[in-house]
Amino acid sequence: MMVQRLGLISPPASQVSTACNQISPSLQRAMNAANLNIPPSDTRSLISRESLASTTLSLTESQSASSMKQEWSQGYRALPSLSNHGSQNGLDLGDLLSLPPGTSMSSNSVSNSLPSYLFGTESSHSPYPSPRHSSTRSHSARSKKRALSLSPLSDGIGIDFNTIIRTSPTSLVAYINGSRASPANLSPQPEVYGHFLGVRGSCIPQPRPVPGSQKGVLVAPGGLALPAYGEDGALEHERMQQLEHGGLQPGLVNHMVVQHGLPGPDSQSAGLFKTERLEEFPGSTVDLPPAPPLPPLPPPPGPPPPYHAHAHLHHPELGPHAQQLALPQATLDDDGEMDGIGGKHCCRWIDCSALYDQQEELVRHIEKVHIDQRKGEDFTCFWAGCPRRYKPFNARYKLLIHMRVHSGEKPNKCTFEGCEKAFSRLENLKIHLRSHTGEKPYLCQHPGCQKAFSNSSDRAKHQRTHLDTKPYACQIPGCTKRYTDPSSLRKHVKAHSSKEQQARKKLRSSTELHPDLLTDCLTVQSLQPATSPRDAAAEGTVGRSPGPGPDLYSAPIFSSNYSSRSGTAAGAVPPPHPVSHPSPGHNVQGSPHNPSSQLPPLTAVDAGAERFAPSAPSPHHISPRRVPAPSSILQRTQPPYTQQPSGSHLKSYQPETNSSFQPNGIHVHGFYGQLQKFCPPHYPDSQRIVPPVSSCSVVPSFEDCLVPTSMGQASFDVFHRAFSTHSGITVYDLPSSSSSLFGESLRSGAEDATFLQISTVDRCPSQLSSVYTEG
C-alpha cells in the first residue's frame, strides 16, 4: 500500500497526538489478544479513508503539482499486511501500524468509490491491500455513513468555521486565542471542515522544512513509539504551545492578516509529492535528538504610514526634513502673496521638500537649484498647486518674479514713514505709493466723465458702468442685480447670505409654540346648551341648530352589523315640513338599508305630548335632543343588565342585530364609542310633557344630577338637560306600552323606560370631515 504526503504543508503535531490517542485503545486490545479484532465502536470514531482522499485531492488542486514522489519519514515501522481471513468489521494490528499517523481509518468507509491512484498501487502483486481487496469489507449496514473529518486545525484548535467564516479575518485570531484548546484534544468538532488547509497566517504556524536528523518521535499511551508526522512536528508542537499558553501579542492582533496560497520561506517548489516504497525503510523505530530551540519570530510590521508620508517611502534618500510634509500650506495675505509657516519656509517644488529657517535661504535655493538647473528655454513653474498649471514663461526674470508669490519674498517695500507694507512686484508698490501721494493718472475715457483712478484696473471697472455692460449677474433666484466687476458681485452675494440668516432666525422664533397657545388647544371648553325643538321649529330653522352649537355628534343606537360600515350617518327622520333645498341625507334615502317607503314623514309623535322629532340635522351642527325611541326597539328582548354605580339606576344595554330595527333605526358610522346606557324614569306618563327650554336657561352641573335621590318630573327633566348638555347624549322617551322592554317588569308596570346612549365624539373645530345623514 502506498501513502501520500505533502512536501510543503505539513500538519502540526496535534494531529499526530490525536490520531495516537484514538488508535491507542485499539492497539492495547490488539496487544492483549492478538487474534481479537477491534470492535466496531472503536473504529467508528476514526476518520475514513474517504476523508483522507478528499483532503489529498483538495491539497493537490491547491498546490498544482506536476511531479509526484512519495516517501515515508524515518522511523516508520513496516508490519505484516492485513490478514485475508479477517472479519468485515475488524482490523489487525499490522494494518493499523502500516498506515501513516494521521491517516483516517474506518471499516465503514466506501473504499471502492475511490480511484486506485490515491493508494499508490503500481502492480497487481503488491503485498499491500488495494481498494479492490478492501472493498469486500465495505458492505456493512453502516457503509454509507461517513465519519467526521479531522484536520490539523480541527485537532488542536477546534474552530467553528460556520461562525467565523462570516466575520473579518482578524476574528479568526481572536477566536483561536480565546479557545485555549489543547493540541491533544480528542473530541472532534462536528462543524469542523477538514479541507480548510490553505489558510496560513501568523495565527497558524507555518511549516518549515528541517533536516531529517531533527525529526521527533511521539510515544503513544500504549507504549508504541510513533514518529512525528511531517518534517516539522516538534517545531509545530512548540509553536502551538506558545500560541496557546502565551497568547497573542497586541501588535500581532492589530496587524494580523490571513494569507492564501503563499509559498513557504525556504521551499523551492510548492506541493511536490515524493513516492517511494514503504518496505525500503528500516523496520525499527529510531530515536532522534530533540529539535533545536525555536528561533525568535520577526517583529510585526508597523502601522501603515499616513497619506502625506507616502512620498518618503519612495524617496529614502531625502533627509530628516522630509518628515515635515504634514505641515499645512502657507496662507495668502490680502495682496495674494504667501507668508512664512511657523518660522519655517518649505520648498514645495516637485520632488523637493526642503525646509529653511530664513526666507532668503529659500529664495536662493529656488533660484540656484530649480531655476538655474533648467536647460534651454523651458521656464516653467513646477510648484505644487500653482494656478498656472505648468504654463511656461518666455523669460527667466519673469519666472523669478513669479516665484516670489510662492516663496513669499517681498523685496519692494513702502518708503513712507510708518507704512510697513511690502510687495513682490514693483508695479504693486507704485500703485500703493499713489495712495500716499494722491496721484491718479488714469482718467476715465468716457466723454463727459472726469473721474480719475490710481490704477488701470479700477478705471476699467468704472468704464464698464458707462457701457452698461454688466456681465456679473447674481445667480440667486429672484434677484436681477448685475455688476461690472466680480468684487461687487461678491459683496452683493454676502449681503444675500446675511439676509437669509436673519430670515431664518425670524422664522425659527415665529415657529416656536407659545405655552399659552398649547394650553388653549388642550383645554376642554364648556359646551353651550342648544335650544329646544319647539324653538327650532318656531324660528324656521331646518336641518341645523340655532346659534353656535357645540361640535358634538350624537350617536343613537344602531345594530351591530352597521357598526362596521363607515362613511355616512343616518339622520333621525325627515323634516316636519317640505324642505326646499336638498340635504345630504336625501341623497341616500333609496339605499337598501333605508328604503323611503318605510320612513313616513312625521310632524309630531304625540300631539298631546308636544314632543317633536328633530329634523335632519346639518352635518356640522348636531345638538343633543330629546327624541322618541323607534317602535321597533320596544319589540325586542334584551339581555340582562348590569347595575351601574352612578346611583340613578343606569343600565347598560348591548344592541342585537335585528332586521326589523334596520329600516327605522338611526345609524351612525365612523364613530368609535358604542356604549349604550339606559335610565328608567320614576314619573308617570301624564307628566312626560317637556316644558320649553330657553337657550339662555342656566343648566346645572352634571355632578349635581348624580345624587341618588328620588326624582320627580321636574328634577328628572333637569337631569336630562344637564346630562344632554354636558355629555351630548340623546335621550329617548319610551311609551307606556313598553312595560317589559328588558324582559322584566320594572319598578312599576305603568312606568316606561327612558334609555340613554353614550357614543358621542368630541372633536376640534374644522378638523373632522362632514357627517352625512340618511333619511
Curated annotation (Swiss-Prot):
Listed Polar residues bias regions: 557-567, 588-600, 632-663
Chain positions of all zinc fingers (C2H2-type): 345-370, 379-406, 412-436, 442-466, 472-496
Biased composition (Low complexity): 123-133
Entry keywords, A to Z: Activator, Congenital hypothyroidism, Diabetes mellitus, DNA-binding, Metal-binding, Nucleus, Repeat, Repressor, Transcription, Transcription regulation, Zinc, Zinc-finger
Superkingdom: Eukaryota
Tissue/organ expression: In the adult, expressed at high levels in the kidney and at lower levels in the brain, skeletal muscle, pancreas, liver, lung, thymus and ovary.
SUPFAM superfamilies: beta-beta-alpha zinc fingers (SSF57667)
Pro residues composition-biased segments: 289-307
A GO CC term assigned to this protein in UniProt: nucleus
Biased composition (Basic residues): 134-147
Renumbered ranges of motif Bipartite nuclear localization signal: 491-507
Chief location: nucleus
Gene Ontology biological-process annotations: negative regulation of transcription by RNA polymerase II; positive regulation of transcription by RNA polymerase II; regulation of transcription by RNA polymerase II; transcription by RNA polymerase II
Cellular compartments annotated: Nucleus
Keyword Plastid: no
Annotated spans, Disordered: 121-147, 282-314, 485-512, 529-665
Molecular function terms, GO-annotated: DNA-binding transcription activator activity, RNA polymerase II-specific; DNA-binding transcription factor activity, RNA polymerase II-specific; DNA-binding transcription repressor activity, RNA polymerase II-specific; RNA polymerase II cis-regulatory region sequence-specific DNA binding; zinc ion binding
Pfam families, per database record: zf-C2H2, zf-C2H2_15
Compositionally biased spans, kind Basic and acidic residues: 497-512
Chain's role: Acts both as a repressor and an activator of transcription. Binds to the consensus sequence 5'-GACCACCCAC-3'.
Disease annotated for this entry: Diabetes mellitus, neonatal, with congenital hypothyroidism: A syndrome of neonatal diabetes syndrome associated with congenital hypothyroidism, congenital glaucoma, hepatic fibrosis and polycystic kidneys.
Similarity annotation: Belongs to the GLI C2H2-type zinc-finger protein family.
Full protein name: Zinc finger protein GLIS3
Organism: Homo sapiens (Human)
Record lineage: Eukaryota, Metazoa, Chordata, Craniata, Vertebrata
Encoding gene per record: GLIS3
